[in-house]
């Protein structure tokens, strides 16, 4: 990407009165973070590590390791599949596995989220013929890893598929209603996994 970014959030960084959960993702996780916070208010502090970096970028792993080691987490929600779409599936799968094993060494409760669809620019009702097959292949790889490691899956793809009214025109992102819908589903998955 021409511009790389990392956006992190520690909620009530000095407080220890509630357990913490960690959301890991790309820009989609930035969108639903506030909704997850509202849903889990009073139950968990909701921290977030979001980045544009592809999963094989060495800085991705270094930054995430540093961030994830700051606190003990009750649960981690891992949603990272919309960046670096030109990389081969094998590279994605290999580095996803490495990242997953690093996370599991810190927290046994990891939820694997399926990435959301990509639509044509200015046509939120039409799936991208070029990019959405990449998302589907990556989601299939995540499902196989979830089965192998016996981890829960949060299907954010199906949650928003076929709902053009909650999509923005850029092909990737969601309206406030779309982010709220995802946030509720993420919070539900976190509550279930963190029990």
Predicted segments, located by residue:
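Serine-esterase "nucleophile elbow" of acetyl-processing enzymes
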Residues: 1-72
